[in-house]
Amino acid sequence: IQDRVILPVVRGMARRGTPFQGVLYAGIMLTPKGISVLEFNTRFGDPETQVVLPLLKGDLLEVLTACNTGKLAALPIVWQAGSCATVVAAAPGYPNTYPTGAPITLPDAYPPHTMFFQAGTALKERQLVTAGGRVLSVSGRGATLEQALARAYAGMDAVHFEGMHYRRDIGKTSLISNSSAQEGETRSAEVS
């Protein structure tokens, strides 16, 4: 993907006299015919960032400052060993029309090694309620992708709102294709 999509786009912008410096997010779908680019954005993708940043060792502000000042190549960016997986909870009807205002129940204590991220939520009379199609996501970290997935799903199982649904196959393809990966390698999986 980097060689066939990202680098040609960045090099093309430089050739046109508009070199790119910053965050370039590519929405990509892998199809039987190959790579299909859905969109480019000059921002972090959400929830894609939620599966990557938990593995960053160090200060994100330092990385962004180095990028902004043209010194990113000189900055060593270190990643934690392990894996992260993110699962997205959606409202019924998403991505088409969906109801809003359903009360959301969250756990009193979050499971270890999980992070909860709000997206389509609102606070109505001191109650957290649904306010969008992608309501929230849960990221789990672990030594292996399998462990990270188990933690993400354990966190998601502790959340409830009417009509809530989420995919149960996140990372399954990665588990099969990475079955020979060594523990300690960095892996991530996310699909909404």
Give a label for each model feature.
Residues 154-168:
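Short arginine-rich
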Residues 140-157:
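Short, well-ordered alpha-helical segments
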Residues 26-30, 35-44, 120-121:
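Short beta-strand elements
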Residues 88, 134-142:
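Short, well-ordered beta-strand elements within core beta-sheets of diverse protein domains
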Residues 185-191:
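Short, intrinsically disordered C-terminal tails of secreted or membrane-associated proteins
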